Amino acid sequence: MNLRELLTAAAITPGFEHPALNQEVKSLRMNSWECEPGSLFIGMPGTRVEGGNFWPSALAAGAIAAVVSPQAKPREGEACVIVVPDIERACGRLAAAFYNYPSQHLSLLGVTGTNGKTTTTHLVEHLLNRVGYPTALLGTLYSRWPGHCEVASHTTPFAVTLQEQLAAAVDAGCRFGVMEVSSHALAQDRVWGCQFEVAAFTNLTQDHLDYHRDLEDYFAAKAKLFTADYLKGRAILNGDDPFGQRLAQQLPRDRYWTYGLSKDADFRAENLNYRSNGVTGAVHTPLGSGTLDSPLVGQFNVANVLAAIAMGAAVGLPLEAMLNALRDFPGVPGRMEQVRLDPEQDITVVVDYAHTPDSLENLLRAARPFIPGKLICVFGCGGDRDRSKRPQMGAIAARLADQVVVTSDNPRTENPQRILDDILAGIPPETAMIVEGDRRQAILQAILTAAPGDGVIIAGKGHEDYQILGTEKVHFDDREEARNALKERLKQPLQRG
């Protein structure tokens, strides 16, 4: 495809003639240093710099042309630099056209919401694969499909990477694609050019208010996924969530299903029996009723399971097949993940990604019934992010845990002590508490001092295998640290309790 054809497909008019318009486009690049002969450079605005300003470097590296926003202010007529007013959406259109509209060649299912995206998408992938449909999964942990798996750098990739990955999944024979859709991605139009067969909304609670103006702005970003620009099929909405209820009011009744524990939900569960290794109960759906036997712990995971079943039903999966497949779901790395050295281990250690007030509360409430002794919560909050949630999380940990260990998460460029102070502002002074800014030492201390029967819940980082200190990313894995601490505990039995 030459540049003129690609621009036409993306509804972009260059406004001038140039020999480059007849050249073949061999690749799309959003970074000037990645450009090569035959590239089309798409200069995106950044938080610190205007990416379009790097068009001279892109052309010097061999790019045949550049597409930029008016903020880049290229000199007219000097080179093949095309200015578009809607650079984010133009990027989505260009990427979709260049990769031959992959979302038209597989059924794309998206999940948005503050919490539950990763678990729900993994569940849907598992159900589809078990029924026999090759499926791509794109999300917080990785992008994977048959024969391919790579660690993800963003919950939702930028438009060029996203369309490239979907095209590769189509080439690999995938019938379905399941992806997490973040509020950042929706606000930045990263998924522009994608058409979703099914879109699910899990919940909305406080998070990312360092990026969004307020909760309403955050909700407006999430709600974009359920407009005609993106969704061509059915919406799956959490009927127990007030923002899910608001979305339902914006859609025709025949365009959505609800899920939850309320009796009027289309997909609902009842007679639930929560265990340390999962939950059983009855599930009722428009497809009929069945027995729920899930290996996932906690009420919040019942909601994730119901969302996944509803999404599967929306693309034609039989209820019985989904319930059977659910029984052997392997779980998700860093989500309620138990760390155990041997079956006789005398304390429970759980690592989880909970990093919002709501997810921390759900985690501690889910763990409490299965901890016979004290519940010890180790957590911190990320730096250069929403400060207002820090005292809230401190208050939640103090209310629901028997002992709180406050530590660092990813301080980034913020003063770590200020982050700790923000958290401590929400913790009553009478709380049993340890403050240890070194996360490794905090985990070690919590595990070494736990008594038999206690539970140590390490929250915030989950699957992450790094810590961001300043601008440097260093290796750090809560699960590794927990295992090391458990080994140390075996050497020092007298320190227990």
Swiss-Prot record:
Molecular function (GO) terms listed?
Answer: ATP binding; magnesium ion binding; tetrahydrofolylpolyglutamate synthase activity; UDP-N-acetylmuramoylalanyl-D-glutamate-2,6-diaminopimelate ligase activity
Secreted as UniProt keyword: no
Q: Which family does it belong to?
A: Belongs to the MurCDEF family. MurE subfamily.
Reported EC number(s) for this entry are 6.3.2.13
Protein name stated in the entry? UDP-N-acetylmuramoyl-L-alanyl-D-glutamate--2,6-diaminopimelate ligase
Encoding gene per record = murE
Which positions does UniProt annotate for meso-2,6-diaminopimelate binding?
R385, D409, N410, P411, R412, G460, E464
Q: Which HAMAP family match?
A: MurE
Localization per record: Cytoplasm
Checking InterPro entries in the record gives: Folylpolyglutamate_synth_CS, Mur-like_cat_sf, Mur_ligase_C, Mur_ligase_C_dom_sf, Mur_ligase_cen, Mur_ligase_N, MurE/MurF_N, UDP-N-AcMur-Glu-dNH2Pim_ligase
